[in-house]
Amino acid sequence: MTATPAAPHLREDLLTPRFYTTEIEKAARTSLEDQRHTFEAMLGEMQADYNREHFDRKAPLDRLRDLSPEEKEAYESYLVRSCVSEFSGFLLFKELSRRLKQAGRPELGELFQLMARDEARHAGFLNRALVAEGIAIDLPTLSTKRPITWFPLSWVLYSVYLSEKIGYWRYILIDRHLKANPGNNVAPLFDFFEPWCQDENRHGDIFNMLIRCWPQLRRGIRGKLLSRFFLWSVFLTHSLTVCERGNFYRILGMDPALFDAEVMRQTNRTASRAFPWVFDMESSTYLSLRDRIVDTFRQLKQAKGLQKLGLKLRFAGLLLRQFSQPMRATQAGAEGVLA
């Protein structure tokens, strides 16, 4: 899979998704006994496919407003990263669906099949936007040339939950901003962010239900470490990615740092419904450390020699300080103790 000659600025590493697999046999032992009512409701909602008509295959996606070459590059890079990310999610859900059905769990398999449907729809829609830009990505090739990373089931449940919820807040905050500032809506693609975020939110709720099927994942030191590590790592990745893609958010009239901070605040608040612990962002130095981490990250990209070594040490120290910031217990954690 390659970018077309029309887009030489798109690096090949943007086009390489990560594919994750997990403990399928353990996943097949998921007990739905205590979550049966929630599971049935969510399965019914997914089967109803409320967003089926929202992603119109005939919707024009090629009416960009006048953008400078640098702005166009930022927009296209955003499309590629987002498209590949959605397709990677499709591959994970499709594989889980297939393997769970083979393991004799057809209901769970169907739920993952329906989530795979949504991810494929998103990836296809983004791919159409890329084609409108004259960029061709051979998505089917990704399924035959993908690196596979194995994660324990607990890691997949925590990380995918956060990925879906942070995706929801990213899309909904961009959607709200553009509705309040229509002059910054530079591409028709953004008109579809509201139904898009509904899919992300629904998927996150499903993974919250799956986490509750394994109450031991929210108990004691294990629950606190899982909460701390995945909130920190997902937020760190988001901050550094927004830093690298700052031009994209400025095209939309958004301050990248403020956007990043609000996404983290809202995702952290939402995670309190699923995780036993979340970061205490309001009374800690978490966000001010974020600013220093991003600044050091920028300097690292330009530094050489001994200066780079010193910056790496500073960067590592800042990461450790942020990782160690205070957390607060949640009601979800109390439920995990009682479960």
Regions found by a protein language model. Give the residues of each.
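Non-heme di-metal
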Residues: 2-339
